[in-house]
């Protein structure tokens, strides 16, 4: 630091005025550079801190924060709104300022130069926290660490302030931001304070919610308070009303409020700083107080944070003092320093004032003042960026599952197989293929296998289709690999306790799937025998992962990898890489292989891969190749820190994973020792591990001569070198699972990994059984001397205390790839003692079928019988919080294992179990909170909740602090039970009840309960109004306390009483009136609880007389234990004051309906909620019964509604049941019962009723004490879905000779005589011209030669389809024509064609000589400079126009100068992207397409005529492309702008969507329904050259739609643009439906051959062809031209059918139309439809019950299209496919058919 320099660093409380997203983006980019290591460290630490703090939030708040990998990701989120606004804004400001501060130093590459004597830190509000991080630092590295803790404090401060403030005034339910502070200028602090004092006095404002001064200086005063009260204060005071004032951007609550916060609040926020910053750490730099203008006196960190917290929460800001403090600093150093510098983050109004004052003070002195902006550096370019580092997290494998040969259908069976040394070798099962015909050991039979051996999984076709929402037909067509990938993924997640969304690492958007697969046997063989609707999604590899992501709603990446034999382990390595890269937080990975195709056997055998003698003989001298094997395996992987935070069971830790390639091998299939060794070194370096420390290696070990020799060499050289030698205690054990279960090919690597994980679990290396004779002589001879060898017997592998065992897993691919994983032991988890203080525990089981639920219950019962030591708390945690819950449910709350066993046996022994079990409703029932009154009070209510749950405790404490600040006593001793009896105090009694109820309501929300309505009984109505947002929590406490105090002061204790009577009001009146002694007794009805429960009140003696009289008539009466008669005349003395107090309380519209016992109705708005309402509620009858009846009448509640009694004891529960006997009511607390047990029982009831409680929050307080149990896996309700390979056609195809017959091209008429106006506008039928408007109607004939030629230049499905450029030319033609009529002197007309929407495609009829008219209607209005257009079809004979248009658009007449200005700003960006594409093409990273190739790709959907083919070359990179365009010189007609020119410059977007490999063009085609705008700066020129550029992207609002902007350039300038052109994805199955000529029916393909009788396999009908080759199929299309292309199109999920025909065999070889009359009477239409649905879906008719939903049956949008076509074709029943959405269940569908068909 310059010795002559004094320095002040100012940390403001406002963001810089720059684009914040850009600042954070630049900060992030710089953090990747090696130059900015400390900046990166700070951002990473801040990310960790924020994730840690967010994880501690209650889930409703946690859900508001999107998943983020870095705090900078949050810069794109609008963090200034919502409940987290204050926290996010505070923390992000702290991050920005400290990030800029650190980056400034590193950008300038200067050392820490802050000299304490010459450096002063200053700041305002949150800025002081950032400054504190610097004040405590002696180096820049310290700032990085301390800064993260400043971020933590900032976040906590924001959370705390927002929470407290929300209790003072309820935030707006619509998200509207209201300021909590206004600044007043030109008034003194004293005069403003006088006005505020007057307002607070006049309005009886409570101290807690008073309006106050939070900041002041000479020129301004800041006034703060709840927004409504601040507004009221300015309206109340004429002086303030007419003062100069502005609202400040303070939207989240109050700081600087000494009346609101105390030391306990400050401690709650700042005590976190001690977690990293030592409390005794010295303060290094002076930090100025914004209140006193003097440096804080603190000497240590803890004192400093305490002072800062006190100032932020309770201190007033005095800017003049800040300025004076800065001047004083400069004055003290003025003699030694001649330069004064103020560093800041941009400037602000406050900072400019400080600058001016300081410079003015030193104006006469010879000092140089410098201003330094700490933000400027971020905009600099520091040259090429050097990557900082790779991620260094360890990874944890937390779950696994398998289906492996030899019956190893779970991990226990797999281990048993290994432990017993079993060999799973068999011959090929008959369900795969017939060895009698396909096996020839001589090799003479073409396409036959020379080996009969393999290793196969049991029951590969068995699958629970219903669980995965698949129809039997879809399940049958789906590859067993895909099915078992789903199953094992679920089982692995079940073992891992993964519940998507439970923790940040398991958020669905952060979970990805990675599977290895190297064959397509099912698709190529079994399913190809009869290709059906689900052939593609059931057989294509990508759908294996896609199904997992789609079913579980994971939106992370899904990759299906093929690296031959190493695919499975390579998929795991890819998953690890994604985790290390931060792309995901959880990965599900595995390998898949199910063998069915004899072709692959033949191919591998002919290539000499396979052994002809049997199993893989790993390291045996007779090794002669590998033996094929099935295998399915899945693992779940997380980063280690996430797994530990999630309380997972860690099976092993991944230290490193690498893949390379044997590029130098002698042949592509030959292994290479050098490459293998290089891969080992890489993975060891990655982990920093000594190879000598590795003690177990699971070899690739295939049992081939070359493979075994090379791997043994590479392993021994690296892991057991000659020198340094391994010590005797460093034995390297080797194993090879292929000797047991064969070579699983794509699943081989995952099988090896599963074995290694089991070795870790079992602490034993199983025996190697691969050496059948003697060891292979090619293996190094000195292995024993090197202390390495195969484990020839089961060998213990104990874990040594203080050390971690290291293991390596190898998997090599036949193509040359090598993958290696390095593993170590899981961390030793020491669980905290679990004292099981909770006396009741929830145990939950669920399934998707009754059979599975029963089996799950039986397996749990069996587990408990075998493990009687099972900890009930762990079992509850596992089954409740760590399981996905399904619609068939069992649940119970028990206190011991025997009770659970009894409950399970009771259910299982019930013979009516199957009929009594019902699935939960598809829609969760509504929930009503019922708040009890004072009568439920007792000491210790909620004691256990207060002790156990920090969230509940914090809510009670915060509400209690509000009560104390309002002058009322603390209620905590009542709630936690530390005082025994305080019922004599009405204030304490009523406040404790209301505070308890508000806290309970918030606790229920934390537990995942979504509230539909509230109702309060008497005192409980205050809590209900607070929870509904009508009044704030602070106001509820204030009013209840005031009301109670008035009662104590104005009402006589014990003079009145209340009596509960078991009779109606009328019955009581009649009985009393009939008695001579009771007729004159006066009483009042206080409460009508039910129709037979009434509470009356009055004078004590008279109530006693009434009780005696009624009891004499056998009427049950109960005298209530209350000191006053509420809701009677005894309350009259308090009413006026109560209303006066309530008059100053703001009332809001309820956020949820309020059921009013006063008004006997439901309240939805604020009109009837006011001070008078509370007055009446205190005095008038509580008509609880009428309120419930009204809610029933209004449909707000019904018999399915769940009611939660919120209060100390369930009083309202009985009242609700009295009104709705069948209703479900649960309690929050119960007298003489543990409140946690009560909540637990209630949660179980809610769970069984169909709600989804947040079990994670229920177990969260003690989660670290619980263990995740390894319980029996889900029991599947399986059916065998297997398509057997029939015949010998894989052999026969070697002898088949195929011929082809070319299709005859369609001939076009090219004549185009025209005497009409233009080629597209043929006749004007109406024209109206007025002064400023014009209307025009035209008619055109699409069969006219010019028009027809334009259409035929753009053909789809061999049909001419009108391109959008046709409508563009027509619009421009009519637009210029009308505009010039109204503005004849205009020189040029520039038009913007906007809002183009084409609802129906226009397809040219193939009937020549006919008329195909269309009408164009246009209306131009000069007042808006726009013209509306509509296109209509018309009748060919009458010319009558259709009622609805098929297309609309608007032409806007605009100034092209604005276009030029807009495009000038964009031109360099577009050119940059074009240059980047060109460079990528040069590098081979993008595809350069010639004109022929580009239009050949286009023919995938569209065939363009030559005139339309203007693109000379294209560079295509996924969804981004550019094209060089030359327009044809001929206009070919009369146009405004020829359509073929428009298409040439714009149809690049269509090529991207229909030709890019980024689009699924095999299953779909893409059509454009329109665009937002189309502009051309100048008219297109014949023969001119242009360039087009586009980047398409998926639209968030519609997953089936893409959009993008097409830029048209001439030279370097943009001369045109198609804005937001949209393309909709449409299944190719529907090509005929949407693009067929209006008058034709086409039959494609020959008739199918005659087939033999159908065979049936497990209920699925199969066609058996008479010849062994697959049969061709027939497609019949009968579609009209006008087919919807826009949002009304029911686009199916990605599935494609080769034919819409059923797989059911037909007796006739030709297609015949449906008969005119059904074979059955019309009354049987429903049964016919049901049978057809059963046939097409593969379900039994009995399964189509009335309550079965189409989603559950697997009827998706594609199947609904197929069914609607079948209904029409076979039954003559016209049903739209959308009806399956409108009638979502079988019952609704059949009712519709009965009604309308």
Curated annotation (Swiss-Prot):
Chain positions covered by the region annotation C-terminal hotdog fold: 1482-1632
Annotated region described as Disordered, given as residue ranges: 1663-1723
Key words, A-Z: Acyltransferase, Multifunctional enzyme, Phosphopantetheine, Phosphoprotein, Transferase
Residues in the signal sequence: none
Alphabetical list of InterPro entries matching this protein: Ac_transferase_dom_sf (IPR001227), ACP-like_sf (IPR036736), Acyl_transferase_dom (IPR014043), Acyl_Trfase/lysoPLipase (IPR016035), Ketoacyl_synth_AS (IPR018201), Ketoacyl_synth_C (IPR014031), Ketoacyl_synth_N (IPR014030), PKS_Beta-ketoAc_synthase_dom (IPR020841)
Broadest EC class assigned to this enzyme: transferase
Pfam families tied to this protein: Acyl_transf_1, CurL-like_PKS_C, ketoacyl-synt, Ketoacyl-synt_C, PP-binding, SAT
A GO molecular function held by the record: 3-oxoacyl-[acyl-carrier-protein] synthase activity
Region: Malonyl-CoA:ACP transacylase (MAT) domain, residue numbers: 931-1251
Domain Carrier: from-to ranges: 1720-1797
GO biological process entries: fatty acid biosynthetic process; secondary metabolite biosynthetic process
Source superkingdom: Eukaryota
Region of interest called Product template (PT) domain, as start-end residue ranges on this chain: 1318-1637
Cofactor (UniProt): pantetheine 4'-phosphate
N-terminal acylcarrier protein transacylase domain (SAT): annotated segments: 17-256
Low complexity: compositionally biased ranges: 1698-1709
Transmembrane intervals: none
Modified residues (O-(pantetheine 4'-phosphoryl)serine): 1757
Enzyme Commission number(s): 2.3.1.-
Domain Ketosynthase family 3 (KS3): 392-825
Disulfide bonds, paired cysteine numbers: none
PANTHER family for the chain: FATTY ACID SYNTHASE, NON-REDUCING POLYKETIDE SYNTHASE APTA-RELATED
Comment block on domains: Multidomain protein; including a starter unit:ACP transacylase (SAT) that selects the starter unit; a ketosynthase (KS) that catalyzes repeated decarboxylative condensation to elongate the polyketide backbone; a malonyl-CoA:ACP transacylase (MAT) that selects and transfers the extender unit malonyl-CoA; a product template (PT) domain that controls the immediate cyclization regioselectivity of the reactive polyketide backbone; and an acyl-carrier protein (ACP) that serves as the tether of the growing and completed polyketide via its phosphopantetheinyl arm.
Function as written in the Swiss-Prot or TrEMBL entry: Non-reducing polyketide synthase; part of the gene cluster that mediates the biosynthesis of neosartoricin B, a prenylated anthracenone that probably exhibits T-cell antiproliferative activity, suggestive of a physiological role as an immunosuppressive agent. The non-reducing polyketide synthase nscA probably synthesizes and cyclizes the decaketide backbone. The hydrolase nscB then mediates the product release through hydrolysis followed by spontaneous decarboxylation. The prenyltransferase nscD catalyzes the addition of the dimethylallyl group to the aromatic C5.
Protein name: Non-reducing polyketide synthase nscA
Source organism of the structure: Arthroderma gypseum (strain ATCC MYA-4604 / CBS 118893)
Lineage, broadest ranks: Eukaryota, Fungi, Dikarya, Ascomycota, Pezizomycotina
